[in-house]
From Swiss-Prot:
Annotated segments matching region SNLS (subnuclear localization signal): 120-177
Reaction catalysed by this enzyme: S-ubiquitinyl-[E2 ubiquitin-conjugating enzyme]-L-cysteine + [acceptor protein]-L-lysine = [E2 ubiquitin-conjugating enzyme]-L-cysteine + N(6)-ubiquitinyl-[acceptor protein]-L-lysine
Record text about domains: The coiled-coil domain (134-201) is necessary for SPA1, SPA3 or SPA4 binding. The DWD box is required for interaction with DDB1A.
Modification(s) after translation: Autoubiquitinated.
One function term, GO molecular function aspect: zinc ion binding
Misc note: Plants lacking COP1 are not viable. Although plants lack TRIB proteins, a human TRIB1 peptide binds to a highly conserved surface on the top face of the beta propeller, indicating a general mode for recognition of peptide motifs by COP1.
Gene encoding the protein: COP1
Name by which UniProt lists this protein: E3 ubiquitin-protein ligase COP1
Intracellular or extracellular location(s): Nucleus; Cytoplasm
Chain segments carrying region CLS (cytoplasmic localization signal): 67-177
SUPFAM superfamilies: RING/U-box (SSF57850), WD40 repeat-like (SSF50978)
Length: 675
């Protein structure tokens, strides 16, 4: 099959052909001065004998022909420029045989005047009467002036009252809006005061725990009989204090710093005092640097963090009364509201990392013989192996620990499986560790056994390029695929034909099973929408999520209820599939044409960019947490700046800050989030 393009470009909806022809009679000739431009009378209202046979309007400037017919002067003159005959009887006619018809002209003017007088408003009739010189006495004029003055005063009064009412309505509306805003701000301030008090109390508890810990260390140090018990006691005390620090949020760093000082004091009897203090100062300086860096990250994303905090605190107030009572008991027992605890978790995870660090790299020149796009990169069930596929027509399986721990020249695939066509997507079976599915540019979906390096099943029902395939987590024998033929097909590994076929009427770019149920799938398509289906009833989707402005290239589930999507409109979006609501839009990367990858875990989203960078977002914050730019020693600055390469695939390691990334040059990097 002939390959049209090498780059995996996201499909776009082709516009329907539209006709915009205009009929010849659409722009009809409107009579100029020779027509009825001076008359306001419609033809149906008057005798047809008064109409010009040429323009079919009231005759204006009537002229009589030698044969006895009357026309508008401009109409008959225009006609005689083209033909020398009468439009009515076809008798020979020239300009010299035209004569003014004064009587008819006067009659037509009177008829027009009578018609106007019948249809005119009383005001127009009164004005017409005055213009004609109607006799009116001075007394009648005075009465009319008085009447008009009173009418004017009344109209001005009504206009002023209306204006005042409009202004008053606006001010009332503005006041209500500002009062609502004030109430909201006051409520938010109350939340903040309560949380400040809770955090201050918790900080005092931490300081007291630190002091108790220091006292106990000194007591143990002064008692020779208990010195041998230090390690056990320290571990036990440290465990308790650490359990407190989990709830301490931003004060964990300070507490750990003080704790280290306490340890140094308890174990420095045999050391010079200066050395003990210098070690403490060094660690204190390091903690201070980390604290400053985290504060900078907070201020850089302050607006998003503020919105996140207020949203979580307000959600608590909107809960039913019974739930609020339970929450109040939680506050009394632990000192934190649920909203504050949730936000502290967000703040902690958001400020924990500031960069992506490369821990391993597989350069395309080391393994691949030519530059090639890695369209998909995926971890297996246990995160021990990962597979790559792309335009090289080959599935390569690597051992993750070997890639990370062994030298670069030893990083070779442990399995290679050749295919007939370029590959677009991979999906490991979530139960059968050695099974992996692929989709390719010919529309074939294949299930492979990586142990035997043989295909187990081949599904060839798709008529065009298949972009996506996914195994169900809950039903290991089921998988779903989507294609440019606008079809979504559900397959079972126990039979050759598709189980379910959905015609979407638009190119399918991505499909994904809900991790909690094999009954639900999300489908992203070139129609800019995400269609969420219950496979038990495919007559129509459960919901269609709208918001993207271009094709949806990826869909991924963070949880059973949270769905992330990527689009070539350079945005990621987060959706709630339980309540069918949009949650958040993420911006910062560039994606206008290509498949650049999307991967998610419980807290973070990561995607590629057409600037050859990897971007990481926290799910609660709309701007990137960090990014990493790919580079290669074989690529000069001019080539890199030209934007010829882009990130093509990304994949998180389960419950880990480690991520696999690949670009269109074929370079694979293992990145890890770092402070």
């Amino acid at each position: 099959m002939e390959e049209i393009s090498t780059d995996p470009v996201v499909p776009a909806v082709k516009p329907d052909p539209r006709t915009s022809s205009v009929g010849e009679g659409a722009n009809r000739h409107e009579n100029d001065d020779g027509g009825s431009g001076g008359s306001e009378i419609g033809a149906p209202d008057l005798d047809k004998d008064l109409l010009c046979p040429i323009c079919m309007q009231i005759i204006k400037d009537a002229f009589l022909t030698a044969c006895g017919h009357s026309f508008c002067y401009m109409c008959i003159i225009t006609h005689l420029r083209n033909k020398s005959d009468c439009p009515c009887c076809s008798q020979h006619l020239t300009n010299n045989q035209l004569y003014p018809n004064f009587l008819l002209d006067k009659l037509l003017k009177k008829t027009s005047a009578r018609h106007v007088s019948k249809t005119a408003s009383p005001l127009d009739q009164f004005r017409e009467a005055l213009q004609r010189g109607c006799d009116v006495s001075i007394k009648e004029v005075d009465n009319l002036l008085t009447l008009l003055a009173e009418r004017k005063r009344k109209m001005e009064q009504e206009e002023a009252e209306r204006n005042m009412q409009i202004l008053l309505d606006f001010l009332h509306c503005l006041r209500k809006q500002k009062v609502d805003e004030l109430n909201e701000v006051q409520t938010d301030l109350q939340y903040i005061k309560e949380d400040i008090n809770a955090v201050e109390r918790h900080r005092i508890d931490l300081y007291r725990a630190r002091d108790r810990y220091s006292v106990k260390l000194r007591m143990l140090g002064d008692d020779p009989s208990t010195r041998n018990a230090w390690p056990h006691e320290k571990n036990q005390i440290g465990f308790n204090s650490n359990s407190l620090s989990i709830r301490g949020g931003n004060f964990v760093g300070n507490y750990q710093n003080k704790k280290v000082e306490g340890k140094a004091q308890g174990s420095s009897h045999g050391l010079p005092k200066k050395d003990a203090l210098s070690g403490s100062d060094s660690q204190s300086l390091n903690q201070s640097t980390v604290s400053m860096a985290r504060k900078k990250r907070i201020h850089a994303q302050f607006n998003d963090l503020q919105e996140c905090y207020l949203q979580k605190r307000r959600q608590l107030a909107d809960q039913p009364n019974s739930k609020q009572e339970n929450d109040k008991s939680v506050v009394r027992r632990e000192g934190y509201s649920n909203g504050l605890a949730d936000f502290q978790s967000v703040l902690t995870t958001f400020t924990r990392y500031s960069r992506l660090r490369v821990i391993a790299e597989i350069r395309h020149g080391d393994i691949f013989h030519s530059a090639n796009i890695v369209s998909s990169i995926e971890f297996d069930r246990d995160d021990e192996l990962f597979a790559t596929a792309g335009v090289s027509r080959c599935i390569k399986v690597f051992d993750f620990s070997s890639v990370v721990n062994e030298p670069a020249d030893m990083q070779c695939p442990i399995v290679e499986m050749s295919t007939r066509s370029k590959l677009s997507c991979l999906s490991w079976n979530k139960h059968e560790k050695n099974h992996i599915a692929s989709s390719d540019y010919e529309g074939i979906v294949t299930v492979w056994d990586v142990t035997t390096r043989q295909s187990l099943m081949e599904y060839e029902e798709h008529e065009k390029r298949a972009w996506s395939v996914d195994f169900s987590r809950t039903e290991p024998s089921m998988l779903v695929s989507g294609s440019d033929d606008c079809k979504v097909k559900v397959w079972c590994t126990r039979q050759e034909a598709s189980v379910i076929n959905i015609d979407m009427k638009a190119n399918i770019c991505c499909v994904k099973y809900n991790p909690g149920s094999s009954n639900y799938i999300a489908v992203g398509s070139a129609d800019h929408h995400i269609h969420y289906y219950d496979l038990r009833n495919i007559s129509q989707p459960l919901h269609v999520f709208s918001g993207h402005k271009k094709a949806v290239s990826y869909v991924k589930f963070l949880s059973n209820n949270e769905l992330a999507s990527a689009s070539t409109d350079s945005t990621l979006r987060l959706w709630d599939v339980k309540d069918n609501l949009p949650v958040r839009t993420f911006r910062g990367h560039t994606n206008e044409k290509n498949f650049v990858g999307l991967t998610v875990n419980s807290e973070y989203l990561a995607c590629g960019s057409e600037t050859n960078e990897v971007y990481v977002y926290h799910k609660e914050i709309t701007r990137p947490v960090t990014s990493h730019r790919f580079g290669s020693p074989d690529m000069d600055d001019a080539e890199e700046e030209a934007g010829s390469y882009f990130i093509s695939a990304v994949c998180w390691k389960s419950d880990s800050p480690t991520m696999l990334t690949a670009n269109s040059q074929g370079t694979i990097k293992v990145l890890v989030l770092a402070a």
